[in-house]
């Protein structure tokens, strides 16, 4: 009898652990974060929380990224106050929102500005990082065990409180550990504890992860320039974070991520936050912090497509068949282009989520595109799409050609069409973008704004003659040669035509609901499917083949 009870208890524990793991994995694999991150000071009072979260619901978000401030959580050492955090959970639950807490602990944007006053004042117990010139910084040293233990204690208390307040993860779905970790002014910390660590051999675990066989000191293995110093610092930041991540796993298992400020504009380590969870340091971070699920980019610079491609890391055999890094964008500039960028990230890279920063402070003109895109994405996800592409165009990057098993789709910015005066009035083109979904053979969905697509067979595309169109949609000028007649008279093969282009919605069951047919002038007499700049639509496109 006793033996049976013991076995039953062990099975219950096992199932609970498996359930926790599955729930954590399901957030990563199934839920799509249509998010927004609050500005840094938006959650410092109960009244602010009660005002801002309902506004986020109205904007169409399903998830809000909310700071949790160490200085408020533990303003008196050893005494935790969860008043702000509890109200955040309560209001989010009322609004039907998910929350991703941002642990503003030892570091926020490299600095230790959110550490409590008792921590800041006790420099002897909680030492600072030091530049190569010997200047102390307002950056707690990750080489100090006192710093780690103080941070870990508060973070663990937060995780324990989440486990008690939201045990089924109905509201809290993921956790960000610290914020934009990195060393500034120097590529690495030069404090006495850091110098001692620098003289030690490179850990075998890191050498193995990087495929380096020859052991040695950090200088011997990597050299002595700023980028070598950055590797040293990245390993130690990652190991620090791993302590917090392991605690989170033990207390209340959920997806965990760290975010990175980009190494942009030709800056060197220390000019940008050195050693953060950047793409070129991903192997070091994955080795030092294996409990972290995602390295996430904060994107404010130009070149959105290039940045996201670096963090949407593909399957590799050495990763045991696991995705090396699922794309999640916790911060992006909130602007009129945010909506099409979200569609691109989800369509091209099957992103976990997208989140414009300081969305609570953005103007209606800046948030409108987010609301429109999230409305389309919510409908698309109801249909559980499998085969998708992302489109994103601007004035320079105007066209993309996709060959989908013989269906050649030429996708362009809407302003490549000649009849919209905004295309040629000299103003900067807004970005156009969309998510393109294959439902089946000759069957597609297009969701977005500011794009146009035509569909051809491969042979059709090969023999296509480029002609500049006039504002009436016909050739701008006549041809004096018979070249056009020669090509068409010798055409041999099938062509694709538009069977129908319907504007639709998708309901909660994933079923399409017809709104209107796009034909005639709206499809250029069957030549293309298009969504104009400023419009946000979901089009169901069906093709047919003819000879």
Model regions: which residues?
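Catalytic-core region of carbohydrate-active enzymes that cleave or remodel glycosidic bonds
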Residues: 97, 243-253, 279-387
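Aromatic- and carboxylate-lined catalytic core of secreted/periplasmic carbohydrate-active enzymes
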Residues: 339-462, 473
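N-terminal carbohydrate-binding accessory modules
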Residues: 13, 21-62
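Aromatic-lined substrate-binding rim segments of carbohydrate-active enzymes
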Residues: 48-125, 234-253
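Short, basic, low-complexity termini and linkers enriched in Ser/Thr/Gly/Pro
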Residues: 7-24, 481-490
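C-terminal beta-sandwich/jelly-roll accessory domains of carbohydrate-active enzymes
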Residues: 421-428, 444-547
